Amino acid sequence: MQQINMADSTRNETAVEEEMRPRAANEALRKLWTTQTLGIAIGCLLLMNFFMNLTVYTQNVYEPYATSHFDGHSLLTTGSIIAGIVRIVSYPLLAKLANHFGRPQGFAGAAVSMAIGNAMYASCRNVDTFLAGTIFDAFGDSWWNIVQQIFVADITSLVNRGILFTLPESLSAIPTLYGGTYLGEHILTTSSWRWGYGMWAIVLPVTAIPTIGIMIWMNRRAKHVGLSNEKVSFMHGASSGPIGKVKHIATQLDLIGALLLIGGLAMTLLPMTIAGRNNTDRWSRPSSIVLIIIGVLTFVAFLVWDGKFASNPIIPYRTIRERNVIIACASVITIAMSDSIYRPFLSSFLQVAGHYSPGAATRVDNAQRVAYNIGALVCGVTLKFVKNTKPTIMLGVVLIILASGLPIYLTNISGTHIASEPAFITSKSLLGVGRGFAQVSLQVSLQAVMEYEQVAIATAVYLSSVGLGSNLGVTISGAIWNSLLPRKLVAFFGEEDGRKIFGSIVVAREYEVGSAERNAIDECYRQTQQTLAIGSVCVSGVLLVLVYLVRNVKLDAEDEKRAAQADEELAWAIKQKEAKEDAPIELEEGRR
């Protein structure tokens, strides 16, 4: 009887201790990262990002040769479209997987997926295998990106998060943007496009090992002090038998919701993307309209399922109901849409109406990419010192609207000519810096208002919103361009010649500069691109309303609150661990 009472007493004490637990284990885990281990982790991410970006820019060199090998098969374009959609729709599912299985497993899965994709590129003997490789590669790239974003959120304070979000990508993107082209050309000269793809199947998994290794080591350190994430087995509660296990997995991962989400977005985006730049005639086909209607209805079904029936919804409503989440996602949709209205035909416009060389036109576009990475990094540093999110969001929005408005003048100065290359580079650089400031600040403000468990899903919805906005913008741009430009050219040159000029910038550039015909072509291009510029700035104007609605987050105050909770949790965990092992636990110096 006395033994039973003692057992009951022990259980009661344990229950009381558990009730007293601060419940901030994830915040406490951050306390275990020293400045040294954090530096190693960011260095590992920088290494992997460098080679991932190098992969992308060398692949751009190989792609025409791979396409030629398959006689320019039209399905390759479709594969590129599908890969783009995969990037958009996979983020929420991958975020859920990262929460269930852990960050090291996510990084490993991403590296393996990218390796499989590049191996399939290198070994393909038909177009179907090449298309499958495209999907694996896109899926792996998205997987790494979302896990990296979640991992950085795991290990950094809000004040420092903007810097560490952007550091690996910014430092690696700029040199690889130019170096990738030279490396790709060198490989084609000395070997073949197959080896150019195949080498990344070896390089990417190897360069992922340091990142995975440091995470596994830190997880073991967390277990040592009693701070391991006490995750229940993924199959806990599953019924016996294969059917019961399948049902359990479907419930845990919300596979029905995932399929409805992926199907709804894919059926909506696929016809929009295919119509996109060059196939706006597809809007007259009933199949395109029907597919969009079914896609929208499927997406509505997803909302109903996740809101009413799913026990573990892939996107919990409490996540998307938060004001800063809604504003952040709406803002990046608007930013990406505005940019994608003006940008798709800019290179063609500069080469025809501006008489730019292909290299000069490429430099204008690259200026925005470089400026974005610089702007994002500067924004991260600014957030560290300003410690408030709204000022940097407002600065980014002002720069975006200014940079979107400048092309209205630059594309058709006095109705006779366009601006110089430096003027366009300045305009695109302003836009890049503006996007860097706005998007980094919005992402930090989104994560700052979320509970730890919801950060992954909220970030996934945010990243998907960027892709959705880009697709909408390209669709609008294609509709305007393919409607206005041919009509203007036909009015000057007649149906046959007008259609030929519209169909090829090579034909358009063959007309002598200064001739009446070339002047007419240039005027048609200027007027059409100016219309796109007007559309772009009109869309960006919506940001003025959104930036007013976004809630400012005081990062230092939020960090102090979380740090206090983390200290309590760490002290509790160490106390429990020492009581079990009857030995003191020493922590490393330099903990943050």
Model regions and ranges:
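Cytosolic juxtamembrane N-terminal segment immediately preceding the first transmembrane helix
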Residues: 1-59, 68
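Hydrophobic transmembrane-helix bundles of small-molecule transporters
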Residues: 194-327
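Transmembrane-helix exit segments and adjacent C-terminal regions of multi-pass membrane proteins
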Residues: 2-11, 508-592
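Small-residue-rich alpha-helical segments with characteristic i,i+4
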Residues: 162, 176-188, 424-502
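Helix-to-loop junctions at the C-terminal end of transmembrane segments
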Residues: 89-103, 188, 375-391
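Transmembrane core module of solute transporters
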Residues: 44-47, 54, 59-62, 71, ...
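Helix-loop-helix hairpins in multi-pass membrane proteins, especially solute transporters
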Residues: 93, 97-256
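Interfacial helix-cap and linker-helix signal at transmembrane-aqueous boundaries
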Residues: 66-67, 97-98, 121, 130, ...
